[in-house]
Amino acid sequence: MWFSRKQVVKPPPDGSRAQPGQVTTKSRGDAAESAAQVFLARAGLIPVESNYRTPGRGGGEIDLVMRTPDGTLVFVEVRQRSGASHGGAAASISPAKQQRIIFAARHYLMRFASPPPCRFDVVLVHGGPGQGPVENGRLEWLPAAFDAS
């Protein structure tokens, strides 16, 4: 009887587990956020920050912070779903998710002596695997999709 040694494959130094050329959920999400930022910039919004995170555990994240020409800060949540089997991208923004975004926005606004007006927009990216959000033009922008009240 012979025994083979178990091979241990170490993850790449960047911490990802993806193989070269493999499309991951994170890479699809990053592409969706980039496409949304370009889309909103073409619509006249000015990029301020991306992937803003509150410090510590249990906080929130804001995908994009944009500014309108009149100075309103726009906190943007980008959601991508390949299908509508569970309600699509819009259905994935639960009240709990909205509260985490609002928490992060309040934290972000603490840097201002006098906070500017703000709103919460959503950009939905529709499309399945292999369907890039930019090429097929399936972005849906929902200005003032929810509020902090």
From Swiss-Prot:
Belongs to the UPF0102 family. Residues 1-30 are annotated as: Disordered. InterPro entries: Restrct_endonuc-II-like, tRNA_endonuc-like_dom_sf, UPF0102_YraN-like. One of its GO terms (molecular function) is nucleic acid binding. This is UPF0102 protein Bpro_0391. Gene3D superfamilies: 3.40.1350.10. It comes from the Bacteria.
